[in-house]
Amino acid sequence: MAIGLVGRKCGMTRIFTDAGVSVPVTVIEVDPNRITQIKTLETDGYQAVQVTTGERRESRVTNAQKGHFAKAGVAAGRLVKEFRVTEAELEGREIGGTIGVDLFTVGQVVDVTGQSKGKGFQGGVKRWNFRTQDATHGNSVSHRVLGSTGQNQTPGRVFKGKKMAGHLGDERVTVQGLEIVSIDAERSVLVVKGAIPGATGGDVIVRPTIKA
């Protein structure tokens, strides 16, 4: 694992290359990630850097959280995340410090994790890309139903994992292999090629790609 950043999805746009090719990109705003805790093998059994970002009203912060943030000497954030790291990656990191967009470089490939948009209860056609049944030719009412879900007496049941209608979306999704096409250090913004999970305004985690 490696240190990453917690950011916020601002939306999508496009940029043009020197050859005039339109490239779809996603803009990610990265407020300074404040280090709230450094975990080590001696104290916690594993090595990690814990960060917080954004702001939260004091009335929405529990006493335990207040004590944790006060001990680190940082303002209370809207969330807390941690990144597993190696001994080398801990060098130069200290509690109360910050991590910004300078962690990455233009052209670097990253993985982005977010919470996908919730779609509610959906049928098999939308959820699993099932084909529809005939629109006519004697078919009525059953145009978008699943059809048969199994066999007869043997095995006499529907197998676990059978693709059926159900809740779609609102789950943790990671998109791998996205290239950073631009970094605006002044505005603390990352611009990555392609789409990332979640709705505009949602929190995302940007890490160096695991498939280097």
Swiss-Prot record:
One of its GO terms (molecular function) is rRNA binding. The modification N5-methylglutamine is found at Q153. One of its GO terms (biological process) is translation. The keyword RNA-binding applies. Methylated by PrmB. It holds the Pfam family Ribosomal_L3. Keywords: Methylation, Ribonucleoprotein, Ribosomal protein, RNA-binding, rRNA-binding. Gene3D superfamilies: 3.30.160.810, Translation factors (2.40.30.10). InterPro entries: Ribosomal_uL3, Ribosomal_uL3_bac/org-type, Ribosomal_uL3_CS, Transl_B-barrel_sf. GO terms for cellular component: cytosolic large ribosomal subunit. Belongs to the universal ribosomal protein uL3 family. Part of the 50S ribosomal subunit. Forms a cluster with proteins L14 and L19. One of the primary rRNA binding proteins, it binds directly near the 3'-end of the 23S rRNA, where it nucleates assembly of the 50S subunit. This is Large ribosomal subunit protein uL3. It comes from Acinetobacter baylyi (strain ATCC 33305 / BD413 / ADP1).
